A protein has these predicted regions:
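Catalytic phosphate/metal-binding cores of nucleic-acid and nucleotide-processing enzymes, i.e., regions
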Residues: 1-110
Length: 110
C-alpha cells in the first residue's frame, strides 16, 4: 500500500469518527515540480486531526511500509512530543491501532 492509499483510508476512518481533518495537497507548478504553497518549516506532518467532541488533537505522519521519516519530519515529531502533543507515524501495519484510536476517542485521555 502506498502513502496515497494509506492517506485515503486514514481520512475515511477519521471522518467516520467525526474528526475534523486538515491536509495540505501538493500542487504541481509550471516547471513540473511538486510544491505545497504553505509557509512554514519543512517536514510538517501530513494530517492534523481534531476531535470536536473530545477535544483531542493528533498529528499524523503517513509512511508506506518501507518509508522513512526525514530529519525535518523527525524534528517536527520530536518537537510535538516535547510539547506534549499526540503524534503518530502511521504505516499500513498500524491500521488496526489508528482505527481504534480514531473510532474510540472516549478510551483515550487528553
Amino acid at each position: 500500500m502506498n502513502e496515497k492509499e494509506l492517506k485515503a483510508i486514514v481520512i475515511n476512518i477519521a471522518r467516520m469518527g467525526g474528526w475534523l481533518i486538515h491536509h495540505d495537497l501538493p500542487a504541481m507548478n509550471i516547471r513540473g515540480r511538486w510544491a505545497t504553497h504553505v509557509e512554514g518549516d519543512v517536514g510538517f506532518p501530513d494530517l492534523v486531526l481534531l476531535s470536536p467532541h473530545y477535544g483531542q488533537l493528533i498529528f499524523v505522519e503517513l509512511k508506506s511500509a518501507r518509508g522513512r521519516t526525514t530529519s525535518s519530519q523527525d524534528n517536527w515529531l520530536d518537537s510535538l512530543g516535547l510539547a506534549g502533543i499526540e503524534h503518530h507515524v502511521v504505516r499500513p501495519d498500524d491500521l488496526d491501532f489508528i482505527t481504534h484510536r480514531l473510532t474510540r476517542p472516549d478510551l483515550y485521555k487528553n
